[in-house]
A protein has these predicted regions:
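Bacterial signal peptide processing site
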Residues: 29-33
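Thiol-based oxidoreductase modules, predominantly thioredoxin-like and allied folds used
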Residues: 61-67, 88-89, 106-128, 140
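Conserved redox-active cysteine motifs that mediate thiol-disulfide chemistry
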Residues: 88-104
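Non-catalytic, surface beta->alpha helical segment in thiol-disulfide oxidoreductase systems
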Residues: 138-179
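Solenoid-like repeat scaffolds
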Residues: 188-192, 224-232, 266-277, 312-323, ...
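Generic helix N-cap/helix-start motif at coil->alpha-helix transitions
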Residues: 193-199, 233-243, 274-288, 319-351, ...
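Residue at a conserved register position within TPR or TPR-like alpha-solenoid repeats
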Residues: 337, 395, 429, 466-467, ...
Length: 559
C-alpha cells in the first residue's frame, strides 16, 4: 500500500489518501453529426450513504466474486442483448466513495443502467482478486464496458464529472468496435475516424488500462501522435489527448514542447468554459504538465504557473463542481507552489524531514478555511471518506502537520473505514521522523482493517514499516509476517492481483531485511510457517511455486 497520495482520479495508482478530480466532456472532434447533445453542468449532489456498498438505489447490481457469477451475468446480457458494465472497487477507497456519492445516485445514470447488465465486484469478496485477474483490473475503482459476448469495449474514467461520465458511457455503449481497434485505425487511418471515435480515445481510462491496449512505455508518444492526428476543427479533444501525453511523460526525458503548444495551453487555462471541461487533467496533473511543458526557472514556466494559478483558483471557486473536485484544485495550487522543492527522500528512523519552501500566507489561509469548511459541512458518509482524506493530505502537503493529524483523529469515529485514516496518520508521523508514532498507527490500521484483500494490503504496509523503522525488532516482524501467512492461507485468491502483490512485497521486503543472513533463524521459521499457505489444496502448481519463492527468490504473483 503506497502511502504517497496523488490525485483521486488516478485510479490505477491508488493508495493512501487520494483526492477527487472531475472533468467535463470536451468539445467534439471530427464529424459533429455523431456527437450526443451535451447536458448543462450541474452541481454534483451526494447520495445518502447506505450500509452495503452495492445497494445504491435504482441500480440492479449483480454481485460477482467468482467465475460462475460472472458467466451468469454475461449469459443474462446475451439473452437481453445488452452490454455488461463491471465496477471493481473497495469500501475504503476515496474515489470509489466519490463515485457512489455523485454518480451512482444520479437519475440519468440509473436510467442509463437499464441498458446494460451492471456487475459489482467488491475487491474484498471471496475470490474477487481472481476476477480482477480475469478482467485485468487492479486499481480501485476500475469500470469496464463489455459486449454481451465478453469482448472489452472501453474502460471508463472514474474521475470525470457525473454528467459527462454518463455521456462517455453512452459513447461506449454505442461504439461499434472496441477501443483497441479504434486506436489501431487512429494511428494507421486517422481520417476514417468519426467524432465519437476520437472522443472514445480522449476519454479512455489510460490510467487503468493495465497495458491491455498499449504498452505503458509507448503511451506518451502514442497520445502525442493521436493529438497531432486529431482533426483541426476539434481543438479541445486534441488538447485533452495532448494533456494526457504530457501527464504520462517521463519526467527524466520530457517531450519537446513547442511554442505553439504552450500558447494553446495558456489559452486553454485562460478560458473559463474550456478549462472547466478539462478539470480532471488540470487539477490531477498540474505539476506533471508544467514540468513536461517547461524547464525549471524558465520564462515559459513562469508564464505557465501564472496561467495555472488563475485557472485553479477559478475551479476552486466553481460551486457547480463537487467538494472533492474543488479540493483537488486547491491541492494542485499547493503542488505548483512546491514544484521546485526537492523530492522527499525515504524517511530514515528518527530523521527529520527536509525543509520546504514557505507557502504564500493567503494560500495557507485558504487551505485552512477550505479543509475546515469541508469538515463542518459534509454529512454524507461516502463524500466524507473521499474529501476528508484529501483534506488531510492537503494540510500535510501545506506544512500544517498538526492540523492534518487533528482532522484525521476527529474523523476516525465518523469514517466507515477508519483504518484508511489511520494509515494517513502513520504516513504523517513517518514523514516527520516520529518512528514510534508511525509504527503505532501502522499497527492499529492493520488491526482495524477489514476484508481479506484489504488486510493483506494493510498487513504488507505494516511489515514494510517495521522493517524500515524498527529493523531490529525481530519478534514483531516475525509475528506480523506469520499472521499474514495465516490469514492468506484462508484466501482462495491470495496470489492474485492486489493480494498477490501484497504478499510479493512482503517477501521482497523480508529478503532485503535478511541481507547477509542478518536474520537467518527468523527467516527459517517464517519459511516453515509458509508451508500450510503454499500447500493448501486449492493452490495451483504456479501458486505453490510463487508461494515457496516468497522468501527465497524474486517474489511474483501467480497471475
Amino acid at each position: 500500500m503506497n502511502t504517497d497520495r496523488r490525485g483521486m482520479g488516478r485510479a490505477g495508482g491508488f493508495a493512501l489518501a487520494a483526492a477527487a478530480a472531475a472533468a467535463l466532456l470536451v468539445a467534439a472532434c471530427g464529424k459533429p453529426a455523431d456527437a450526443p447533445k451535451a447536458a448543462a453542468p450541474t452541481p454534483a449532489t451526494p447520495a445518502p450513504a447506505t450500509t452495503a456498498a452495492h445497494t445504491e438505489g435504482g441500480i440492479d447490481w449483480k454481485d460477482a466474486s467468482n467465475d460462475s457469477q460472472i458467466d451468469a451475468a454475461f449469459a443474462a446480457a446475451r439473452e437481453a442483448n445488452k452490454p455488461v458494465f463491471v465496477y471493481w472497487g473497495a469500501k475504503w477507497c476515496p474515489p470509489c466513495n466519490q463515485v457512489k456519492a455523485t454518480l451512482f445516485n444520479r437519475q440519468d445514470f440509473i436510467e442509463r443502467s437499464r441498458g446494460f447488465v451492471p456487475v459489482y465486484v467488491d475487491g474484498d469478496s471471496p475470490g474477487a482478486q481472481k476476477i480482477g485477474a480475469r478482467f485485468h483490473v487492479s486499481g480501485y475503482p476500475t469500470m469496464v464496458l463489455f459486449t454481451p459476448q465478453g469482448q472489452e469495449v472501453t474502460r471508463l474514467p472514474g474521475e470525470v464529472d457525473p454528467v459527462r461520465y454518463t455521456q462517455v458511457l453512452t459513447l461506449g455503449m454505442n461504439a461499434s468496435r472496441p477501443v483497441a481497434a479504434v486506436l489501431a485505425d487512429a494511428l494507421a487511418r486517422p481520417a476514417s475516424l468519426g467524432t465519437n471515435d476520437w472522443r472514445l480515445l480522449a476519454f479512455y481510462s489510460w490510467d487503468t488500462d493495465q497495458q491491455q491496449v498499449i504498452d505503458k512505455k509507448r503511451l506518451p508518444a502514442t497520445l502525442l501522435a493521436l493529438a497531432d492526428a486529431c482533426p483541426a476543427d476539434a481543438p479541445d479533444t486534441a488538447m485533452r489527448l495532448r494533456l494526457k501525453a504530457l501527464a504520462a511523460a517521463d519526467a527524466k526525458a520530457p517531450p519537446k514542447v513547442d511554442t505553439a503548444t504552450r500558447a494553446a495551453l495558456v489559452a486553454l487555462l485562460g478560458d473559463s468554459a474550456r478549462s472547466r471541461e478539462q478539470t480532471d487533467m488540470l487539477t490531477n496533473y498540474a505539476a506533471e504538465i508544467v514540468r513536461a511543458a517547461s524547464a525549471k526557472s524558465s520564462p515559459e514556466r513562469t508564464t505557465l504557473l501564472g496561467a495555472f494559478d488563475t485557472a485553479l483558483k477559478r475551479l476552486e471557486a466553481d460551486t457547480t463542481l463537487s467538494r472533492a473536485d474543488r479540493m483537488q484544485a486547491l491541492i494542485a495550487q499547493v503542488d505548483l507552489a512546491r514544484i521546485d522543492d526537492p523530492e522527499e527522500a525515504p524517511a530514515r528512523p528518527g530523521a527529520k524531514p527536509a525543509a520546504r519552501a514557505a507557502l504564500p500566507a493567503a494560500l495557507v489561509a485558504d487551505v485552512r478555511e477550505q479543509t475546515s469548511r469541508a469538515d463542518r459541512e459534509i454529512t454524507n458518509g461516502y463524500e466524507r471518506q473521499a474529501v476528508i482524506t484529501a483534506a488531510a493530505y492537503l494540510l500535510e502537503r501545506a506544512g500544517l502537520d498538526a492540523d492534518s493529524d487533528a482532522l484525521l483523529k476527529a474523523n476516525l469515529a465518523k469514517s466507515h473505514s477508519p483504518y484508511y485514516l489511520m494509515s494517513e496518520l502513520a504516513s504523517n508521523a513517518k514523514k516527520r521522523g516520529d518512528s514510534a508514532e508511525a509504527l503505532r498507527w501502522y499497527r492499529e490500521a492493520f488491526e482495524k482493517s477489514e476484508g481479506p484483500a484489504t488486510r493483506l494490503q494493510w498487513g504488507s504496509s505494516y511489515i514494510a514499516a517495521l522493517v524500515d523503522l524498527a529493523p531490529n525488532d525481530e519478534s514483531a516482524i516475525e509475528a506480523a509476517a506469520g499472521q499474514l501467512w495465516s490469514e492468506a492461507e484462508k484466501q482462495p485468491d491470495a496470489f492474485y492481483q492486489r493480494s498477490g502483490r501484497a504478499l510479493g512485497n512482503v517477501g521482497t521486503k523480508l529478503q532485503a531485511w535478511n541481507k547477509g543472513g542478518a536474520h537467518r533463524a527468523a527467516m527459517k521459521r517464517l519459511q516453515t510457517q509458509l508451508h500450510p499457505l503454499c500447500a493448501a489444496p486449492a493452490r495451483s502448481s504456479s501458486e505453490r511455486a510463487t508461494c515457496e519463492a516468497l522468501l527465497t527468490g524474486p517474489a511474483k504473483q501467480s497471475t
